Design a protein with these regions (language model features):
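Compositionally biased, low-complexity repeat tracts
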Residues: 26, 47, 95, 104-106, ...
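Short amphipathic alpha-helical segments, especially helix-boundary/capping motifs
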Residues: 49-56, 97, 113-116
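Alpha-helical hydrophobic/aromatic positions enriched in membrane-embedded helices and signal peptides
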Residues: 71, 98, 124-126
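Short, flexible coil/linker segments at or flanking structured domains
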Residues: 51, 60-61, 92, 104, ...
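Flexible ATP-lid and adjacent glycine-rich G1/G2 motifs of the Bergerat
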Residues: 103-161
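Short beta-strand/loop element within the Bergerat-fold HATPase_c
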Residues: 91-99
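N-terminal assembly/transducer modules of large multi-domain enzymes
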Residues: 2, 6-89, 145-150, 154-399
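Short beta-strand element(s) in the Bergerat
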Residues: 100-102, 185
Length: 399
């Protein structure tokens, strides 16, 4: 296959054509030795290789990104979900196991070489994978750990390798053909350290532990003109998902235990795929948006607060006094430092059985003011001083 035939056979875009090399060019330039190429073909007898394309990643760069095998799988799966949602409006991906080989498959448009372009690819704002380089990092991370990765679409095969001939090692896509015709994209991961059962928690609607626990699923826009996407709250503790994809235990990623679990669409992770300290306030604001839209979620939320002792009617002063002292080591308690969801005060009152007396509740500053308010026929409510001023919609007591 000459160069013109090579470019046409793989529909190599003009932006990548200058970087791509035919098999003959790669051997002539010493990018691959004849023995390395022969070994590559022996290890993949189902494929016929015709050339290569550099990825522009070194092993050192991939190592600095601190990916894990699980994060790599997450990147593959979220790309599959994005593709199918873009095509059909509904996210879908399949995994299957053949011995030690794991397959991740979708019925999207089928991956093209443009996905391997240096600098990443353009993503829609609603997509799960919005940085554009996740697929390349996922594949090179696994290959750096001697886990072979091949991507298939149409009758094309994109096999990721680390060339031993290049100085310090360079990652390449080896371009090949297969006798099969593939619809969508299939990713083959040989010697996979994870099996398909391990992957179930990675996707919120795959996780059997969350089945039947949904309390709220609220669809809303990030900003005018953006698509409406769902954020959810679950009656299950301590899990965080972003755009259906698993981030981790809330106690680990947000450094606070959570009484409930959350799947937040319009919250963004850092480019490192982690939750950074500076973005934690945005996490609470996004949870607040879901709570503001869902009465059942507010009711459960307040019930959890009361069960944890954060909200109660206390008689420690010898009078009934509402006390709200959130535990800041919990997500649900710390939320009130940043926001008070719409309708939450009403939920407090309903949970405490004071709906008929809500107009008598007064916010007080200290114990003395609580006693005085009670003597005037009011129900005093004490709030922790660090809480958001949005709670000041509760009328203050005036003597």
């Amino acid at each position: 296959m000459n160069r013109k035939e090579f470019v046409e056979a793989f529909q190599i875009p003009e932006t990548l054509a200058a970087l791509a090399m035919t098999k003959e060019e790669a051997l002539e330039k010493g990018v691959f030795s004849a023995s390395s190429w022969e070994r590559l073909c022996e290890n993949n007898p189902d494929l016929t290789f015709h050339g290569i394309l550099p990825l522009g990643f070194s092993p050192e760069y991939v190592l600095r990104r601190e990916f894990s095998h699980m994060i790599a799988m997450r990147e593959f799966i979220q790309n599959a979900l994005d593709e199918t949602e873009l095509v059909s409006g509904k996210p879908s991906a399949q995994t299957r196991q053949e011995g030690n080989t794991l397959w991740i498959e979708d019925n999207g448009r089928g991956i093209t070489l443009d996905a391997f372009r240096m600098g990443g690819v353009t993503k829609e704002s609603w997509m799960r994978g919005y940085y554009g380089e996740g697929l390349k990092l996922a594949a090179t991370h696994l290959v750096a750990h001697q886990i072979p990765v091949t991507l298939f679409a149409r009758n094309d095969a994109y096999h990721i390798v680390l060339s031993p001939e290049t100085r310090q090692g360079t990652f390449f896509v080896v371009l090949g053909k297969t006798n099969s015709t593939i619809e969508g994209t299939k990713i083959r991961i040989k010697s996979s350290p994870l099996n398909r059962i391990d992957l179930l928690p990675l996707v919120r609607f795959w996780n059997p532990l969350l089945e039947g626990t949904t309390i709220a699923e609220e669809h809303y826009e990030d900003q005018p003109g953006s698509p409406s996407k769902p954020s959810c709250i679950f009656d299950y503790p301590n899990e965080l998902y972003v755009r259906n994809m698993y981030v981790g235990k809330m106690s680990k990623v947000a450094k606070r235990d959570a009484l409930l679990s959350y799947d937040l669409w319009w919250f963004r992770l850092d480019v490192t795929r982690t939750l950074q300290t500076a973005t934690v306030p945005l996490l609470f604001e996004e949870i607040s948006k879901v709570l503001s839209r869902s009465l059942p979620a507010r009711q459960l939320f307040v019930k959890k607060l009361r069960e944890a002792g954060m909200l109660k009617i206390s008689d420690r002063l010898g009078i009934p006094c509402i006390e709200f002292n959130p535990i800041f080591a919990t997500v649900e308690g710390h939320l009130f430092v940043y926001a008070c969801p719409a309708g939450m005060i009403d939920a407090f009152v309903d949970e405490l059985g004071l709906k008929d007396q809500q107009d008598k509740i007064r916010r007080v500053k200290d114990d003395d003011e609580a006693r005085l308010a009670h003597s005037k026929g009011f129900i005093p409510m004490q709030l922790h001083y660090e809480l958001t001023e949005e709670l000041h919609v509760i009328p203050a007591f005036t003597a």
